[in-house]
Amino acid sequence: MDSTLKCTILLILLGLVVNAFSVTDYEHCENVVKKWATNSLKHESKEDKHALKDLLFFLHVPRTGGRTYFHCFLKKLYSSSLECPRSYDKLRFDPSKEKCRLLVTHDDYSISSKLPRGRTSVVTILRNPIDRVFSTYEFSVEVAARFLVHPNLTSATQMAGRLRSKNKGVSTLDIWPWKYLVPWMREDLFARRDARKTRGTSDFTSGDPYNMEDIVMPLLNYINNPIAHEIVHNGATFQIAGLTNNSYLPESHEVRHCVDKYNNLGDYVLQVAKKRLDNMLYVGLTEDHRESATMFANVVGQQVISQLVNSNAIGKGANVNNSEQGTSFSDSELDQNTNSDEKGNETTSSDDNEVNQDNMTVEKLMDTYEVCISGLRKTQTRRRIASLKRISPANFTKEVS
């Protein structure tokens, strides 16, 4: 047989094998994703989604304003004794404990598999995905920049480790997704600062804060990096679907891998996320902040007040203690525990200790919320300005927690 013909036949056979493997791999992925989606939808509650259950799970999607809701709504309603212990890296409480009534966490929806079925209501806030990506990038830079007070990365890392082991509070470095994003950005900031010192450069010409590569990782580099691709891309959808890299589901990694490899399979994930949103007690929108806050007070706040009054639980915990349980993980976006200078300024302006929960009404709740949010924003602004000074002239405008 002619050698050219042999080569042609060999190439054809090789192509058929590769194609067969590709089809088999796609079918495998399709089966994996469809099985997960079917099981997820099958376990969705058929009960009245408008009625507040015994446990309120606030699924905090990062950079949507959830910290404001926690401090200015939920901490005004629930005493610290009713808060579930933090579950920032693993479940830290017995879900059957009746006294535990409020869980606020960056954990994804998969944690609900550990919560009392039929006795848990879920609430969340969503934000325009593009704005949320910008804000995630900016917050990664803002927190990482706080470490630049140290002479080098080794010093910063060691000090952070010592403070985290000494303090009972929860650091941002313990919280998903910041426990991945901040160290990555921190290492990059120190590398760029060291490079500037080596070159002896201090003149920066770019006026675009998202493209100042001499000072900070450009936004384009950030969003195209595998770390951001794993955590930030479609982050809210994966969080609501329970498929983040912090998921409690053993199949989550494979499902996420298949969806990343075959984008059309993402529709199954989207349908599960949409169904879960539809079954939640409340879904707010960052862009419609005022309207969403008013709705939260009337839909969720009113039921919490009624529920706690009936159980004689409201009004007994206005003075929030400073125990580990009372140290809010949502404080992590202000409570960095990175160095003594930062730590000295870590105060919460929401005046948790001054709230009288007796005779609480929706109207009083909204009045308290307005005062609280004003103070909280001032604190966040001061902290943001102080942090960004360390990477001047880079500066950002978006600011939602």
Language model segments and positions:
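Membrane-interface amphipathic segments in extracytoplasmic regions
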Residues: 2-401
